């Protein structure tokens, strides 16, 4: 039986429903929009598929687990209990970053430090090392703490998905490509009619509309 993953897709505020609609069109299951993010479930094969085809989401994060934590001890123990060795190899680099909102553990640098220590303890025990080399591939660890509920994730995207790679140079005050794609989606443009943006600036919205019309990732 194929393994099922929980994905967390960060989204710009106000376009979560648009991201959710796109995920449903891409065939993801149990799609649920929340403030600033959309949750869904899929298979390992969906990881590259989402990173290639998702137009409106910011990143594709793989959720490894969640728990309640009001103290640093609870944060440490909860993180150390997760099977990090299933995802991070012996030489993997695993920096930690994230945010905390409306929680007892409000210091982000302190949470980063505690989580790093928890991962080092778990991985060091599994691999039989006192000090992990961290000389290999990058495995960016992300955390969110919202009202004392901790979610730990791995970033599968690298650069944010708004960095499409089609610009030879940046223009002043650019519109993010993910937001432009969301605006085109909200306009219900499907590529069959003419598209006009009289105040197109650096052309982000028409470019995203053209990609949708051509069905290009």
Label each residue range with its predicted role.
Residues 2-139:
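Non-catalytic nucleic-acid substrate-recognition regions in nucleic-acid-modifying enzymes
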Residues 167, 175-217:
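Conserved S-adenosyl-L-methionine
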Residues 99, 146-185:
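Class I S-adenosyl-L-methionine
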Residues 140, 149-151, 192-195:
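Beta-sheet entry/capping signal
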Residues 46, 102, 149, 158, ...:
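Short loop/turn segments at secondary-structure transitions that flank enzyme active sites
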Residues 35, 154-156, 199:
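Glycine-rich, histidine-containing beta strand-loop boundary motifs that form or position
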Residues 110-112, 158, 210-214:
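Short, glycine/charged-enriched secondary-structure capping and boundary segments
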């Amino acid at each position: 039986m194929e393994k099922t993953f929980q994905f967390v897709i960060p989204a710009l505020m106000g376009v979560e429903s648009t991201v959710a609609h796109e995920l449903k069109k891409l065939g993801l299951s149990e799609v649920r929009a929340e403030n600033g993010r959309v949750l869904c479930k899929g298979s390992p094969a969906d990881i590259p598929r989402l990173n290639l085809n998702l137009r409106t989401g910011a990143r594709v994060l793989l959720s490894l687990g969640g728990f309640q934590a009001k103290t640093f001890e609870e944060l440490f123990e909860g993180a150390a209990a997760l099977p990090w060795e299933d995802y991070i190899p012996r030489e993997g680099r695993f920096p930690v970053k994230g945010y905390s909102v409306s929680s007892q553990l409000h210091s982000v640098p302190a949470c980063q430090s505690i989580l790093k220590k928890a991962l080092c303890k778990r991985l060091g025990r599994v691999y039989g090392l006192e000090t992990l080399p961290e000389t290999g591939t990058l495995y960016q660890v992300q955390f969110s703490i919202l009202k004392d509920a901790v979610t730990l994730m791995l970033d599968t995207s690298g650069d944010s998905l708004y960095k499409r790679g089609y610009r030879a140079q940046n223009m002043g005050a650019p519109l993010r490509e993910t937001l432009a794609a969301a605006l085109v989606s909200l306009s219900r443009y499907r590529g069959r009619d003419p598209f006009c943006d009289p105040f197109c600036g650096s052309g982000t919205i028409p470019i995203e509309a053209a990609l949708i019309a051509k069905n290009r990732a």
